[in-house]
Amino acid sequence: MSGIHETKWKIFVSRLRKYLKNYGGWSEVFASPFFNLALILSFLNFQLWQSDWVRLSQSLIPSMLGFSLGTYAILFSIISVKLKRALKEVKNERGIPYLHEMNATFFHFIFVQVLCVTVSFLHTGTSLHSVLTAVVGPSSDLNDVFWLGRMISGLVGSTLVFYSLFLAIAAAMIVYRLATIVEPEPK
């Protein structure tokens, strides 16, 4: 990899790490009631794993993504410099400024939605199966591996669909909490 491409990847990974830190890390994701509820609903709706979640993902999520990006852009464009300063002073229980937490929450909402649609496209792809079948030949073991892969991606995908829906509530809660913040006293 050339130097400029390597630098761009390092910057990209660094920004993702910063977002994840401000969001609360993987522990925050896996401990989230929204994620847990999404996982439970996915297990209860085994039929979705087959392929129904793909249709849901590709029909629901793009509209939600447009709404998310629009809300994110509008919210951050109307916040005044004074309010941004105040939001940097208000910290959550982990010591992360509320402005960074709010930003990370909206980014997480968008990131999960994009991931959901991406997984749906990968789930429906057949190129890898076709290439391996051509190289190795038809094999029941190969078919078993691909069946297991489709079940796993179906579970992941349906969980992401539910999680994307529930994250709309999380984003609304951030905006609601923003309205309840009291400006800190001058020092």
Label for each model-derived stretch:
Residues 127-146:
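Membrane-interfacial helical/loop segments at transmembrane boundaries in membrane proteins
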Residues 1-40:
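N-terminal juxtamembrane cytosolic/stromal segments of multi-pass membrane proteins
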Residues 23-33, 95-118:
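Loop-to-transmembrane boundary segments
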Residues 59-78:
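Hydrophobic alpha-helical membrane-embedded segments
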Residues 111-133:
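Alpha-helical transmembrane segments and their membrane-interface junctions
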Residues 87-105, 141-146:
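Short membrane-interface loop/juxtamembrane segments of multi-pass integral membrane proteins
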Residues 148-177:
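Alpha-helical membrane-embedded segments
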Residues 74-94:
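Membrane-helix interface/capping segments
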